[in-house]
Curated annotation (Swiss-Prot):
GO molecular function, one term: proton-transporting ATPase activity, rotational mechanism
Quaternary structure, from the entry: F-type ATPases have 2 components, F(1) - the catalytic core - and F(0) - the membrane proton channel. F(1) has five subunits: alpha(3), beta(3), gamma(1), delta(1), epsilon(1). F(0) has three main subunits: a(1), b(2) and c(10-14). The alpha and beta chains form an alternating ring which encloses part of the gamma chain. F(1) is attached to F(0) by a central stalk formed by the gamma and epsilon chains, while a peripheral stalk is formed by the delta and b chains.
Main location as per UniProt: membrane
Protein name per UniProt: ATP synthase subunit b
InterPro entries listed in its UniProt record: ATP_synth_B-like_membr_sf, ATP_synth_b/b'su_bac/chlpt, ATP_synth_F0_bsu_bac, ATP_synthase_B_chain
Subcellular location: Cell membrane
Coiled-coil features, chain-numbered ranges: none
Length: 168
C-alpha cells in the first residue's frame, strides 16, 4: 500500500530502498571520503598551527634581534661620542702644547734678538768712541801744527764733523 508523502503517493518499497541507499552512501562516504577528508583537514589544521607557531617564534626572534640591534646601535653611538670627546680633548691638549712651544720659541728668539741688538749697540759705541778719539787726536795735532785763530779752529772742527758724517 502506498504511503502518502506531501500529498504524493510514493510506494513504501521505494522509500525503504531510497533510505537504504542513502544510509549505505553515508556509511561509504564516512569510511572512504569523510575519514580521509577529516585526516587531510586535521593535517592542514596541524600544518597551519605549526606555521603560526613558527611565525610567532620568528616574530619573537625578530623582535629580539631588533632589540639587540637597537642596543648595539645605542652602544655604538655612545662609543662614537666618547671617541669624539677624547679627540676634542686631545686636540685641545695638543693646541696647548703647540702654543706653549711657540711662546717659548718666541721668547728665545726675542732674547736672542735683544742680545744681538745689545752687542751691536756696544760695538757701535766702541767704534764711535774710537773714531771720536782718532778725530780728536787728529784735530789736536792739526791745531798744534798750526796755530789757528778761533775761527779757523771752529771751521776745522766743522769740516771734520762733516767728514765723519759723510763717512757714515
Amino acid at each position: 500500500m502506498p504511503t502518502l508523502l506531501l500529498g504524493a503517493a510514493i510506494p513504501f518499497g521505494t522509500i525503504a530502498y531510497t533510505l537504504f541507499i542513502f544510509l549505505l552512501l553515508l556509511v561509504m562516504l564516512r569510511k572512504f571520503a569523510w575519514g580521509p577528508l577529516m585526516g587531510i583537514m586535521k593535517e592542514r589544521e596541524e600544518h597551519v598551527a605549526n606555521e603560526i607557531d613558527a611565525a610567532e617564534r620568528n616574530n619573537a626572534e625578530a623582535k629580539k634581534l631588533v632589540e639587540e640591534q637597537r642596543e648595539m646601535l645605542k652602544q655604538s653611538r655612545v662609543e662614537a661620542q666618547e671617541l669624539i670627546e677624547r679627540a676634542k680633548k686631545q686636540a685641545v691638549d695638543q693646541k696647548d702644547v703647540i702654543v706653549a712651544a711657540a711662546k717659548e720659541e718666541a721668547e728665545s728668539i726675542k732674547a736672542s734678538a735683544v742680545q744681538e741688538i745689545q752687542r751691536e749697540k756696544e760695538q757701535a759705541i766702541a767704534a764711535l768712541q774710537e773714531q771720536v778719539a782718532s778725530l780728536s787726536v787728529q784735530i789736536a795735532s792739526k791745531v798744534i801744527e798750526k796755530e789757528l785763530k778761533e775761527e779757523d779752529q771752529v771751521k776745522l772742527i766743522r769740516d771734520y764733523i762733516k767728514e765723519v758724517g759723510e763717512a757714515r
